[in-house]
Amino acid sequence: VEEWIIRDEASILNQLGFKVSDFVEQRISDGTFKKNDLEFTKNSFVQKNIMTECENIYAKTYKDSIINLIEDKFSFEKKVYERSAQLYWFGGELINTVENIYEKWNLFLSCFKILKCEVSNSIALDQNNMRPRAALRWRLICLHNSNGFFGLPTNKEIEIYGISHAEFGKEGIVREFILIDEISIWKQLLL
């Protein structure tokens, strides 16, 4: 049995009134975060064998959607979300409507040149009286090469770890949860 235990530390920090980047800078200056921590972070992503009994059309659709969304940087030819979709974004943010969802993804991705996108785990479930749903664990290897959400470009190669959960309606995703380790991103940029 594999269990993913996670929490949105960026959301906790935001609720306490801290900026994530300031928190990481403080932890670097007090010696809590060290450069050798990065090697552990970068070696922690292991691709697992896909459990075929947990894979179905929704897992494949979601996996393809996320990869296309990230790699194609929003050539919106393929419809991924229903018009009234909701996105629960890392940091405790709730985004409503498909236009705002694409804008949020674009803002996040615009400061990176994506070098590699891979999914290590996918699982899906389709039960009576519930919306079909799927979950993914994924990683991006990218170059921080543009201004944006993560400040001025550092030209550092970083790894971004994420998990996603989606619920599907008749025309696409109706509700999605995205959790990204924002503290890890800032550590890689600032150390």
Q: Language-model segments: which ranges?
A:
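C-terminal and inter-domain tail/linker signature
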Residues: 1-191
